[in-house]
């Protein structure tokens, strides 16, 4: 019954804000048409607004869970029009706070201690309140030196899980209906969108997980002059309560306060871009909810000429597979060099395009996306927009992007927005390119590769005795398969030639891999003899020969 009432309320809001066109061609549209005479329409002022603005207002009226839904939907620029996405980014996740005494009870249940024991002071008036949780100021009991440390305690809203489950169940039902009846369901992919929202909300409901995210990010940036991450107080953290060191700063979009504090906004904007690319390509652990409200600037007067960011809210973090990291980095470098052919090849190699797509067709599509950007002033070029448009090209071939890539493009868009707000003339390309080149040099340097091989040495040594037998068995199968092939046409002869080339490439690649293994073994054993730096000469020779063999195998594609 509650679900029916909730669905009817959603229907009334859709009609009042004149959003029924979104359901055109579905059974829901027919039901709404019947109900339309009985629902008061929005004022002329609201009716005059754009569809994106009307959708934003409707989501705000439906409540905090739908606000969160709109915020997540705003990141899916591959699915919704740009004008709607821009409006949804204006959604504010601020709601009426719940009772401070209820927050105290939740903290006591989570920690298994009375608040009066766990904290020297706990302010029941929240500092901030959002749809999932609210934040309270507190003070820890004195430590061994008699110091009382200031902290903040993030507390989940009471019964939030039940509210989310009910609304998500309703969204699943609506998504199923839209998927069955909407003429553009294959493009919208409603069930996929709802599943993404469900996953995001589920992650934000576990504050212990958020604490772990903050702890990992802090470890990567400890001692940095670019980014500060508050310390997690693990003794006062549980699934429904997260305690962090209290930090003071200025929101990154409050330009007036930044100027009053004497902050070098130009230096700060460049740092923001560098921090993002370092998180993605060095650490492979990036803050994926990096809007201005979650990025503060350290207000310490001594840092005004060398400012640093403060990260907040670690509920959503992103990671890429090694393959996506590599292909994305290479894609950025191809964009920097205007190498459209390479961009097309990378999209196919990465699996973002079907393997049977014509490379020249894809090259032309990449050129049509990128060239208009290169005619703009450098301060107006957006890598995020280029990436989004390239992924939209991929959508023509009905491929589904990985959620982490969607997270990344949304985060890049946010970071560019913050950077341009701080410094409207920010040349993102000039800042990003040297950072990316340096990280790639370090990531794929011989020393780094040998170090990775050395880490895997025990695993390699364990499986090494089986390698000759496995290689021999595989080659034998290939030879037998070739002899059994009955060639009857020129196409089959071409296929046979292709298979022979493939076998040669595989053998060359296996040889190269074997030589790299030998290089790693020699490096790990520290043999007597000549050294070049800290690496044995024979390791350099074996590693160089192995790398050359792998390069030859790659060039013979």
Curated annotation (Swiss-Prot):
Enzyme class at the top of the EC tree: transferase
InterPro entries: ABC1_dom, Kinase-like_dom_sf, UbiB, UbiB_bact, UbiB_kinase
EC number: 2.7.-.-
Matches recorded under Pfam families: ABC1
Cellular component, GO, one term: plasma membrane
Catalytic residues, chain numbering: 289
GO BP term, example: regulation of ubiquinone biosynthetic process
Family matches, as CDD domains: UbiB
UniProtKB keywords: ATP-binding, Cell inner membrane, Cell membrane, Kinase, Membrane, Nucleotide-binding, Transferase, Transmembrane, Transmembrane helix, Ubiquinone biosynthesis
Binding residue positions for ATP: 127-135, 154
Compartments where located: Cell inner membrane
Pathway(s) annotated for this protein in UniProt: Cofactor biosynthesis; ubiquinone biosynthesis [regulation]
Segments forming domain Protein kinase: 121-509
Membrane topology of the entry: Multi-pass membrane protein
GO molecular function terms attached to this record: ATP binding; protein kinase activity
Spans traversing the lipid bilayer: 506-526, 535-555
Function: Is probably a protein kinase regulator of UbiI activity which is involved in aerobic coenzyme Q (ubiquinone) biosynthesis.
HAMAP family (alphabetical): UbiB
Protein family according to the UniProt entry: Belongs to the ABC1 family. UbiB subfamily.
Protein name per its UniProtKB record: Probable protein kinase UbiB
Lineage of producing organism: Bacteria, Pseudomonadati, Pseudomonadota, Gammaproteobacteria, Lysobacterales
């Amino acid at each position: 019954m509650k679900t029916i009432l909730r669905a009817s309320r959603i229907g009334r809001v859709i009609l009042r804000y004149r959003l029924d066109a979104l359901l055109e061609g579905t059974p829901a549209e027919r039901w709404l048409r019947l109900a339309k005479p009985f629902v008061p329409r929005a004022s002329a002022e609201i009716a005059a607004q754009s569809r994106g603005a009307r959708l934003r207002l409707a989501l705000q009226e439906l409540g905090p869970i739908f606000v969160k839904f709109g915020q997540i939907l705003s990141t899916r620029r591959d699915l919704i029009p740009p004008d709607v996405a821009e409006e949804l980014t204006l959604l504010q996740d601020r709601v009426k706070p719940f009772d401070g005494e209820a927050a105290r009870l939740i903290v006591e249940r989570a920690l298994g201690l009375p608040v009066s024991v766990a904290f020297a002071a706990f302010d029941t008036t929240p500092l901030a309140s959002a749809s999932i949780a609210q934040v309270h100021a507190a003070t820890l009991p004195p430590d061994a030196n008699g110091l009382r440390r200031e902290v903040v305690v993030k507390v989940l809203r009471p019964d939030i899980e039940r509210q989310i489950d009910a609304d998500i169940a309703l969204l699943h039902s609506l998504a199923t209906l839209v998927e069955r009846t909407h003429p553009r369901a294959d493009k919208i992919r409603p069930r996929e969108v709802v599943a993404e929202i469900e996953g995001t909300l589920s992650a934000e409901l576990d504050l212990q997980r958020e604490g772990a995210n903050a702890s990992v990010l802090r470890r990567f940036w400890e001692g940095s002059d670019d980014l500060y991450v508050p310390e997690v107080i693990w003794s006062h953290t549980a699934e429904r309560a997260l305690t962090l060191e209290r930090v003071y700063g200025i929101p990154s979009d409050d330009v007036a306060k930044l100027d009053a504090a004497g902050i070098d906004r130009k230096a700060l904007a460049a740092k923001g871009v560098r921090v993002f690319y370092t998180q993605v390509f060095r650490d492979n652990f990036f803050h994926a909810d990096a809007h201005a409200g979650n990025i503060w600037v350290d207000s310490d007067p001594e840092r005004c000429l060398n400012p640093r960011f403060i990260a907040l809210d670690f509920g959503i973090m992103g990671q890429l597979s090694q393959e996506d990291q590599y292909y994305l980095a290479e894609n950025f470098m191809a964009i920097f060099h205007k190498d459209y052919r390479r961009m097309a090849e990378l999209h196919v190699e990465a699996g973002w395009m079907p393997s049977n797509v014509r490379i020249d067709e894809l090259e032309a599509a990449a050129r049509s996306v990128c060239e208009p950007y290169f005619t703009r002033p450098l301060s107006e070029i957006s890598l995020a927009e280029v990436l989004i448009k390239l992924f939209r090209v991929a959508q023509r071939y009905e491929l589904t992007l990985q959620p982490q890539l969607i997270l990344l493009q949304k985060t890049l868009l946010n970071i560019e927005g913050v950077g341009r707000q701080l410094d409207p003339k920010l040349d993102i390309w000039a800042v990003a390119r040297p950072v990316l080149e340096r990280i790639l040099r370090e990531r794929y340097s011989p020393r780094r590769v040998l170090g990775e091989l050395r880490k895997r040495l025990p695993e390699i040594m364990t499986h090494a005795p089986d390698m000759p037998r496995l290689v021999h068995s595989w080659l034998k199968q290939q030879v037998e398969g070739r002899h059994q092939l009955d060639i009857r046409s020129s196409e089959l002869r071409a296929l046979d030639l292709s298979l022979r080339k493939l076998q040669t490439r595989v053998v060359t690649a296996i040889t190269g891999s074997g030589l790299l293994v030998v290089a790693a073994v020699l490096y790990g054993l520290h043999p007597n003899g000549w050294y070049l730096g800290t690496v044995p000469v024979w390791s350099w020779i074996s590693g160089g020969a192995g790398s050359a063999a792998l390069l030859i195998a790659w060039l013979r594609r």
